[in-house]
């Protein structure tokens, strides 16, 4: 199979996954997590039950959606000590590369945040997913920095990036015309000035 055919198939898979997730979030926003069935979700997303279950095993998984894969070039650059040569800045670049795979719009991010704060179960599941993502990113740091780098430092670095992203996201959701990645850079620079 050609690379373009593979990327087209991956693009279609991502679009279907995203559509299902957005429908799950809208249904959760309106009816609560227990207020709709997987059949309702399949109908709303215009997919068969079989397709729905091929993408997500549960409503909760559908609401949380799929975490996009890191672009291989960004992952390789990070592993090799780049793109900036500073762990925190390089982690920031990695996080922005992950976000850029399918950068959501303000309305989508507002819906996601409403759903998260509106349901303790969704929030707890999102926290578990963040912990897994923290472990994954910490593993990338340890691969890059070597065995002598403390795992606690790797996890702390990821959590710092998460806090900066959350601050940027809050500002982004308040409105204005600055894109999320610019706001992230702004908060990264502010954090750097606090620590120097």
Give residue ranges: language-model regions.
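Hydrophobic alpha-helical connector segments
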Residues: 73-112
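Amphipathic alpha-helical packing segments from all-alpha helical-bundle domains
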Residues: 120-145, 152-159, 167
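C-terminal peripheral helix-coil segments that are non-catalytic and often amphipathic
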Residues: 3, 174-196
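Short hydrophobic/aromatic patch on the recognition helix
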Residues: 47-56
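Hydrophobic alpha-helical segments that form the core
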Residues: 116, 124, 151-170, 183-191
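Short amphipathic alpha-helical segment with a characteristic S/N-K-E followed by hydrophobic residues
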Residues: 58-63, 73
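Short secondary-structure transition hinges
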Residues: 69-76, 107-135
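Basic, helix-initiating cap at the start of DNA-binding domains
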Residues: 1-44
